[in-house]
Amino acid sequence: MFAGLPSLTHEQQQKAVERIQELMAQGMSSGQAIALVAEELRANHSGELIVARFEDEDE
């Protein structure tokens, strides 16, 4: 599977981590927090995208 992912600076990555931690502190599961922050990043990102390939099967 290929996915277009936002290319983030270190500062943007750090803010995303802090946002995930904040949501988890409020009682959200880690999976939900990551999914929400990823959705927010995709919705608000205006920079470059990188292409990443994810393997669904174990080798």
UniProtKB/Swiss-Prot annotation:
<dbReference type="InterPro" id="IPR005371">
    <property type="entry name" value="UPF0181"/>
</dbReference>
<dbReference type="Pfam" id="PF03701">
    <property type="entry name" value="UPF0181"/>
</dbReference>
<comment type="similarity">
    <text>Belongs to the UPF0181 family.</text>
</comment>
<protein>
    <recommendedName>
        <fullName>UPF0181 protein YoaH</fullName>
    </recommendedName>
</protein>
